[in-house]
């Protein structure tokens, strides 16, 4: 969308939000306010750019009579370039999911018990990062291994309050999907040999009910008895729920809640996120067939990152990021690697927008 169109949309939204009648429909008012907040940084930067350009003209006129104003004109010109670059960045087409909450799934892969133990390390890393960001977290379902690791776990991570541009859960975590590889000496290794294991991470934008309609007739719902670590029975009732979405074959299970109804609601929540992700992936694939892809898509089956314990090194293979602070990263200090991924994505989006 062109800048003039965005400015027109902003001023129209400003008028709509000033109308008390609009706020009678709270859902509509929230939608309008959200869009207004997205456009506000663009308009503010545009206004600042206009002010600086006006100041440049004045400084140049004064410099023609008094050379002492030449330095001020140069400083203003540099400021204008910064504002132009900022405006270009703000005009990059946004990921429509950037303000969404996230469903994050971590699954042990090759490596057996060691993989499950590393899965628990990754879960702790994401929970600590969420805590640092002030996000809310909720464990939806989990299956433990014999040594207390995770065979699989599903977590909801939610924004808290108003989402600042570039700080939303999806915006920060969307590149975490893929295969995470660990190189270390497992606790089960008696001879001190380094093993390589892998854990799969899937990150989905959480879907609202109005975004994904699920027909009960498309579901097969099975109930069974919940189990804990090592197959221990969690309770004596059939409260665990497994939902199969027949049209797609997607299967979601949940056993963490005490009641069958609660487990069903949580499973449906995960199912909605998976269906939304599948629909968006299909739409992106269709669009890519008609035009060159404007943004890189991450193959969630590829190896994206390696955690090397002997060297205290973390490497992200997509952007060539490397740092020797693995202990800090696993304690939730993820901003370095995440920002490298966000910056690479922003650069590609900017280049695509200029084509």
Swiss-Prot record:
Gene3D superfamilies in alphabetical order: 3.30.160.20, 3.30.70.1660, 6.10.140.1950
Cell compartment(s), UniProt: Cytoplasm
Modified residues (N5-methylglutamine): 232
Molecular function (Gene Ontology), one example: translation release factor activity, codon specific
Keyword terms: Cytoplasm, Methylation, Protein biosynthesis
CC terms in the record's Gene Ontology section: cytoplasm
Processing after translation: Methylated by PrmC. Methylation increases the termination efficiency of RF1.
Pfam families membership: PCRF, RF-1
Matches recorded under InterPro entries: PCRF, Pep_chain_release_fac_I, Pep_chain_release_fac_I_sf, Prokaryotic/Mito_RF, RF-1
Role this protein plays: Peptide chain release factor 1 directs the termination of translation in response to the peptide chain termination codons UAG and UAA.
PANTHER family in the cross-refs: LD18447P (PTHR43804:SF7)
Family listed: Belongs to the prokaryotic/mitochondrial release factor family.
Name the UniProt record assigns to this protein: Peptide chain release factor 1
Organism expressing this protein natively: Thermobifida fusca (strain YX)
């Amino acid at each position: 969308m062109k800048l003039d169109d965005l400015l027109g949309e902003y001023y129209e939204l400003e008028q709509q939000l000033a109308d008390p009648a609009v706020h009678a429909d709270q859902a509509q008012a929230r939608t309008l306010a959200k869009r207004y907040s997205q456009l506000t940084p663009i308009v503010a930067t545009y206004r600042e750019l206009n002010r600086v350009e006006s100041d440049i003209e004045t400084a140049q006129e004064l410099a023609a009579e008094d050379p002492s104003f030449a330095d001020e004109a140069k400083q203003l010109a540099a400021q204008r370039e910064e504002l132009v670059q900022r405006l270009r960045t703000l005009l990059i087409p946004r990921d429509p999911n950037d303000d969404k909450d996230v469903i994050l799934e971590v699954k042990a892969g090759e490596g057996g018990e060691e993989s499950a133990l590393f899965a628990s390390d990754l879960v702790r890393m994401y929970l600590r990062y969420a805590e640092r960001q002030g996000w809310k977290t909720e464990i939806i379902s989990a299956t433990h291994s014999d040594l207390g690791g995770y065979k699989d776990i599903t977590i909801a991570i939610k924004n808290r309050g108003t989402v600042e541009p570039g700080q939303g859960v999806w915006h920060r975590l969307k590149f975490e999907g893929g295969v995470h590889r660990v190189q270390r000496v497992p606790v089960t290794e008696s001879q001190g040999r380094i093993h390589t294991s892998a854990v799969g991470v899937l990150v989905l934008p959480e879907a609202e009910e109005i975004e994904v309609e699920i027909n009960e007739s498309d579901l097969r719902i099975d109930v069974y008895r919940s189990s804990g670590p090592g197959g221990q029975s969690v309770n004596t009732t059939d409260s665990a729920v497994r939902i199969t979405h027949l049209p797609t074959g997607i299967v979601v299970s949940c056993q963490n809640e005490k009641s069958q109804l609660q487990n069903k609601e949580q499973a449906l929540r995960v199912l909605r996120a998976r269906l939304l992700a599948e629909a968006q992936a299909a739409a992106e694939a269709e669009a890519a067939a008609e035009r060159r892809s404007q943004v890189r898509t991450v193959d969630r089956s590829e190896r994206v990152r390696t955690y090397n314990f002997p060297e205290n090194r973390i490497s992200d293979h997509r952007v060539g990021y490397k740092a020797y602070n693995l202990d800090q990263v696993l304690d939730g200090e993820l901003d370095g690697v995440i920002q490298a991924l966000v910056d690479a994505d922003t650069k590609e989006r900017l280049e695509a927008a200029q084509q």
